[in-house]
Amino acid sequence: MELCSSSPSSSLLRICSSSAPEISFSSSISQFPSKTQSILTKSRFQNLRICASVTAETQGLPRDSPQRLLKELAQRKTATGPKKKVPPKRFILRPPLDDKKLAERFLNSPQLSLKSFPLLSSCLPSSKLNNADKTWIDEYLLEVKQALGYSLEPSESLGDDNPAKHFDTLLYLAFQHPSCDRARARHVKNGHSRLWFLGQYVLELALTEFFLQRYPRESPGPMRERVFALIGKRYLPKWIKAASLQNLIFPYDDMDKLIRKEREPPVKSVFWALFGAIYLCFGMPEVYRVLFEVFGMDPDADECQPRSRRQLEDVDYVSVEFEGKKLGWQDIATYKPPEDALFAHPRLFRACVPPGMHRFRGNIWDFDSKPKVMQTLGYPLTMNDRIKEITEARNIELGLGLQLCFLHPSKHKFEHPRFCFERLEYVGQKIQDIAMAERLLMKHLDAPGKWLQEKHRRLLMNKFCGRYLREKRLHNFIIYSEEVHDRYEHNRRLRNPATTAVQQAIHGLAYTIYGKPDVRRLMFEVFDFEQIQPKAV
């Protein structure tokens, strides 16, 4: 390789290959060995063209002259590679808003307009709807409400104390999936993503409670398969088409002719966001109505049945209200606990804690471990009961439920399949998810749903859940069988999933007995999931 001029009259120096491996612009540089020559001929140098203007006086200088070498090196430095692409404007950071503009933006936001419904308020758009948004509402909203079975009157006519007053706005946001035209607006995109972030956990919790009460003897494995067969993303287009909503999601395409990766993400996004809006405005009973009446989900359909597996014989009793009948969605949606009920969700408690647990009352764990566990968790809570016997009965059931939370499947599952924490763990996972989702939505008003999803996942990673339980030294009270006790005590790969399951079972028990407020107390005050409380030195 050498630097040479292409002709005596040429003014350009070009890199050209030659049989003699020498560099002609300097005699002071020795010849390179063949290895160095192969390095210089790499692809990153092939596209680099060195152009230098050779003046007459440079040509007149001898080859060994230092002035000639300096001039050629100076010209060589001016050679540049290909121009770098300028990043798109949306990736260029903008200067932050000053305090005055930021305060105005938040104070004028609809998200701070409802003091009595903080969760609903946090899911409203960050700015008021504009004319383009209202155009979509005028054209399509009546069709949506008619398909879902709602009144065609504008929801703004309702009173301020009714959360359904904002249903039209949330319903509009629910259908603005990321692939549609209106999703480019910031308030629409963030509003839709925040709704689907909440809606996915609403669906999981609703179907979990439904199947736990419908199948009081079944383990969580088959129930998870039933839930997936109803709301798995590959099945959602079928439900959207059953409600005749596909033209609102794909106004320019035939949904049946789209490939899966183009059809399923928008449908899933709209489906989740729709149930987030329904839950915020009407609560869980309306979620059941839309699922089973509007979309026509059938839990008894052949495609919704779990795969056949070896079932352990269940010889224990179930509660009287489950005996001899299978509950339907109407029974669960319309159920209201009696005034003197022991628990916030009495039927769900009976579905998770078998009546036979009373045989463990007064055992060694009940006397030795239960007081320490209850003291750590802050139980029993103070309740305003009319009759003293109700308080005593609740505390007895609370103790039995706590013992079930710490009862590992290795102890009694093969003889008594429901004498373990699995069913409480299942409902605890879902109530834990929705409690954290509501917390993040109210805490981060301007965050999009995708960011909240990642934050949610990191805060609730299984290994962290078990770690919080171990920090309270509660893992020492888990009841293992004698055969596996030493293995679980000294092997973290076995111990950590078990402690995670116990923590989720505790959340499930708290939900069934005291309701969602106690789940929040355990997560954010006792176990400090967000790790924001000062640590004891």
UniProtKB/Swiss-Prot annotation:
Gene Ontology terms: biological process: mRNA processing; RNA splicing
Family annotation (PANTHER family): RIBONUCLEASE III, RIBONUCLEASE III DOMAIN-CONTAINING PROTEIN RNC1, CHLOROPLASTIC
Q: Sorted alphabetically, which Gene3D superfamilies does this protein's record hold?
A: Ribonuclease III domain (1.10.1520.10)
Q: Which GO terms describe its cellular component?
A: chloroplast; ribonucleoprotein complex
Report domain RNase III positions. 141-283, 415-515
**First and last residues of the transit peptide:** 1-51
Family matches, as SMART domains: RIBOc
Q: What is this protein called?
A: Ribonuclease III domain-containing protein RNC1, chloroplastic
Gene name tied to this protein? RNC1
Q: How does it assemble?
A: Interacts with RNA. Part of large ribonucleo-protein particles that contain CAF1 and/or CAF2.
Which Pfam families does UniProt cross-reference here? Ribonuclease_3 (PF00636)
In which compartments does the protein localize? Plastid, Chloroplast
- What does it do? Binds specific group II introns in chloroplasts and facilitates their splicing. Acts on both subgroup IIA and subgroup IIB introns. The substrates of the subgroup II also require the CRM domain proteins CAF1 or CAF2. Binds both single-stranded and double-stranded RNA non-specifically, but lacks endonuclease activity. Required for plastid ribosome biogenesis.
* The UniProt record lists the keyword Ribonucleoprotein: yes
* Molecular-function GO terms, alphabetical: mRNA binding; ribonuclease III activity
Matching InterPro entries: RNase_III_dom, RNase_III_sf
